[in-house]
Design a protein with these regions (language model features):
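Residue-level marker of positions within ordered structural domains that often coincide
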Residues: 1, 29, 128
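Conserved SAM-binding loop
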Residues: 10-104
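Class I SAM-dependent methyltransferase Rossmann-like catalytic core
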Residues: 1-13
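Acidic/proline-rich low-complexity IDRs
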Residues: 5-8, 21, 58, 155-161, ...
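Intrinsically disordered, low-complexity regions
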Residues: 8, 18, 35-38, 141, ...
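S-adenosyl-L-methionine-dependent methyltransferase catalytic module, highlighting the catalytic core
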Residues: 80-81, 85, 91, 95-191
Length: 191
């Protein structure tokens, strides 16, 4: 898709009811109907075929109202630079939804293309004013919420979930390797 065609697609999606959504690393399925997909694989059917580790992304500034990143951030070479790009392409107040394996999950380590093993606390980094100052005075996020998902053992997962809901920090420091989580689901909002 050319830049002109992408611009026309974004304009059409904006007239369909609000700012468009972007699905980074969309694969074969979009996170929401009508989302513009960006993926490195041509087979994905993404509107934007692009490697997330090439900067800048071929997307306009300040357009998207929602960004979905499901199981992509752990593959990025430079997460900080990637999040700066996410911020650049988003409108102020855009919602950013990120799902990634928790560091205690075996799934975090079984895929050899995973470059990072993340914790729930990772996403607080992007809300720190030092992040905005380090990258750009206009780059920052609010952390709307972060949760861990569990799966596999009803009793033990229930206990892990209960502990994590009471204190993510305590769970990650004391229980993560005993009661491993599956994924982290983070919801950020651009400032």
């Amino acid at each position: 898709m050319t830049q002109a065609e992408l611009g026309e697609l974004i304009a059409r999606r904006m007239t369909d009811g609000g700012p468009p959504a972007l699905d980074i690393g969309c694969g074969l399925k979009r996170a929401e109907p009508g989302a513009i997909g960006m993926d490195w694989s041509e087979e994905s059917g993404a509107e934007v075929v692009w490697d997330v580790d090439r900067y800048p992304w071929p997307l306009p500034d300040g357009v998207f109202g929602r960004v979905h990143m499901s199981h992509i951030i752990e593959h990025m070479d430079d997460i900080v630079r990637g999040m700066k790009e996410v911020h650049r392409v988003c409108r102020t107040g855009a919602d950013v939804f990120i799902t990634t394996p928790h560091f205690s999950s075996h799934n975090s380590y079984t895929d050899p293309s995973h470059r990072h093993h993340l914790s729930a606390a990772t996403f607080k980094y992007f809300t720190d004013r030092r992040f905005a100052t380090f990258l750009s005075p206009r780059c920052g996020f609010d952390l709307v919420g972060v949760e861990l998902t569990f799966g596999g053992n009803f009793v033990l997962d229930g206990l892990g979930r209960l502990i994590a809901r009471r204190s993510l920090k305590w769970y990650e420091r004391r229980c993560a390797w005993i009661l491993p989580a599956s994924d982290i689901r983070a919801h950020l909002r651009t400032l």
